[in-house]
């Protein structure tokens, strides 16, 4: 941790002796800079270009050194637009990696990749800053306690429970509900959770970042009257930013979370939306740096880049980081190198299915594809484990019978299979749930369902006690009592129609 009382801005430390170079070449967001012999900057050092463009506008671009080319030249990637830069412009080597403000001063504020506030609420205290590049905690510092993290979402808590201090991935293609699910988790966990949260918006829509900020202000997670009382820091590098910014914004958010864990010894929640964009930005930068592409056009350093980010997201004896990451799945192909590399680092995976989304079942979590290392009898208890396995078995049997049903119809099934299908359809609908953050779209109030209630509900469906109820009674309800009440209402309505 570096404390620098004299900083010229969040991203850069002031140096007594400036090491100056000049721009030799500009290719989009990539700059080649020539330095005097023996004065070469280190890899990952921050370089700053200051000056004026041809119209007289002030320019202030920060870059990060990526390659040493030889002949006293380095290749750097810009963290903001390179418009107005020209060959021959002066470049200052700051002598250190990008550093961002950390600690209580970051709470309630929105930052860019350089740690500069972008919310028009004035400057941030930059006395305590930390470099965004650092090594992961040593083995001896890691903590291995196992406990469940309750989310209030039935399908998650029952079938793929999250680990406190673990890494969780939300996998899905375009438009199946990853961002809504991550917003709901922020709503359910960040409000109930006593510690602080850090949200990293990596290469996603600016509108969603704005909606999230407004929502947090409304819910009190960000306290407008007293910013210091806020519970969350937001870091955004959106879709319209250069690849350098999108590639590093995840590290900026992580650095802020690490400070709360290591120095303040707090339990931190880290939300990243979307980790695929981190890989995508790395792929763009890799091509710009002239590296040979690997499988499916991704960068050859894909595993290394992902590992260096993911290994820092961990729980130590000082505090924990529980991270929830949305992972875009290109063309719904889970074997694509980007999601496949991410899988290896996670404790729980929540896979969103387009088929369920098409049926209108939200959250569209696939009960058979989603997995968790926590679903073991010694961790969750025998009853929870048993119910979860029976729910999966029933769903799997229904999946196997779907072809027969499509060709021959339900009447050709045996009595036992017909009962299985009826229960599986009730389970499928009962796994849906109204969300708090979707209230504005659906008009139905959100529901938080405790784990004990969830287990009781599925126990009743599997035991056959609710076989007489219509399946639509289980759709978009909270606990099982709401389903029975809805069934009675449906019965009354149908009698009135007659």
Curated annotation (Swiss-Prot):
GO cellular component annotations of the record: chloroplast thylakoid membrane; mitochondrion; proton-transporting ATP synthase complex
Enzyme Commission code(s) on record: 7.1.2.2
Binding site for ATP: 172-179
Catalytic activity entry: ATP + H2O + 4 H(+)(in) = ADP + phosphate + 5 H(+)(out)
Primary localisation category: plastid
Enzyme class: translocase
GO function terms (MF aspect): ATP binding; ATP hydrolysis activity; proton-transporting ATP synthase activity, rotational mechanism
Keywords on record: ATP synthesis, ATP-binding, CF(1), Chloroplast, Hydrogen ion transport, Ion transport, Membrane, Nucleotide-binding, Plastid, Thylakoid, Translocase, Transport
Gene Ontology biological-process entries: proton motive force-driven mitochondrial ATP synthesis
Domain of life where this protein originates: Eukaryota
Membrane topology: Peripheral membrane protein
PANTHER family from the UniProt entry: ATP SYNTHASE, ATP SYNTHASE SUBUNIT BETA, MITOCHONDRIAL
Family named by the database record: Belongs to the ATPase alpha/beta chains family.
Its job: Produces ATP from ADP in the presence of a proton gradient across the membrane. The catalytic sites are hosted primarily by the beta subunits.
Subunit structure of this chain's protein: F-type ATPases have 2 components, CF(1) - the catalytic core - and CF(0) - the membrane proton channel. CF(1) has five subunits: alpha(3), beta(3), gamma(1), delta(1), epsilon(1). CF(0) has four main subunits: a(1), b(1), b'(1) and c(9-12).
Protein name: ATP synthase subunit beta, chloroplastic
Gene name as annotated: atpB
């Amino acid at each position: 941790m570096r404390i620098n009382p004299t900083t010229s801005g969040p991203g850069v430390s002031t140096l007594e002796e400036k090491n100056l170079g000049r721009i030799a070449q500009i290719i989009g967001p990539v700059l080649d800079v020539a330095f005097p012999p023996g004065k070469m900057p280190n890899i990952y050092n921050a370089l700053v270009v200051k000056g004026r463009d041809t119209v007289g506008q002030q320019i202030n671009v920060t870059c990060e050194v990526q390659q040493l080319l030889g002949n006293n030249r380095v290749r750097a990637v810009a963290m903001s637009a390179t418009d107005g830069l020209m060959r021959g412009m002066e470049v200052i080597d700051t002598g250190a990696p990008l550093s961002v403000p950390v600690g209580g001063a970051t709470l309630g504020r929105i930052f860019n990749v350089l740690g500069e506030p972008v919310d028009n609420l004035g400057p941030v205290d930059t006395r305590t800053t930390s470099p965004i590049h650092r090594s992961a905690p040593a083995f001896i510092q890691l903590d291995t306690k196992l406990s469940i993290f309750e989310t209030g979402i039935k399908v998650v808590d029952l079938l793929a429970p999250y680990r406190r201090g673990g890494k969780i991935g939300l996998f899905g293609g375009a438009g199946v509900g990853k961002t809504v699910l991550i917003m709901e988790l922020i709503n359910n966990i960040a409000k109930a959770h006593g510690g602080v949260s850090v949200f990293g918006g990596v290469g996603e829509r600016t509108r969603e970042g704005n909606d999230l900020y407004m929502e947090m202000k409304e819910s009190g997670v960000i306290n407008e009257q007293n910013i210091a009382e806020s519970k969350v820091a937001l870091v955004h590098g959106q879709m319209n930013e250069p690849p350098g910014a999108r590639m590093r914004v995840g590290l900026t958010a992580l650095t802020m979370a690490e400070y709360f864990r290591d120095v303040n010894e707090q339990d931190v929640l880290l939300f990243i939306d979307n980790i695929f964009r981190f890989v995508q930005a790395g792929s763009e930068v890799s091509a710009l740096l002239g590296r040979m592409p690997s499988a499916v056009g991704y960068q050859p350093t894909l595993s290394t880049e992902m590992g260096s980010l993911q290994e820092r997201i961990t729980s130590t004896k000082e505090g924990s980081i529980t991270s929830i990451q949305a992972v875009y799945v290109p063309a719904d192909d889970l074997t694509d190198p980007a999601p496949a590399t991410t899988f290896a680092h996670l404790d729980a995976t929540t896979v969103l299915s387009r088929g369920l989304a098409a049926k209108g079942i939200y959250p569209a979590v696939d009960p058979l594809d989603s997995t968790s290392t926590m679903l073991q009898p010694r961790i969750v208890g025998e009853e929870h484990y048993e119910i979860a396995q029976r729910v999966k078995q029933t769903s799997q049997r229904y999946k196997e019978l779907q072809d027969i049903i499509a060709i021959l119809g339900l009447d050709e099934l045996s009595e036992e299979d017909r009962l299985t299908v009826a229960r599986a359809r009730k389970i499928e609908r009962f796994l849906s749930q109204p969300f708090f953050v979707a209230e504005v779209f659906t008009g139905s109030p959100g529901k938080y369902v405790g784990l004990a209630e969830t287990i009781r509900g599925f126990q009743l469906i599997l035991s056959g006690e609710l076989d007489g109820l219509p399946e639509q009674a289980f759709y978009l309800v909270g606990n099982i009592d709401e389903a029975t009440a809805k069934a009675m209402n449906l019965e009354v309505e149908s009698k009135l129609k007659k």
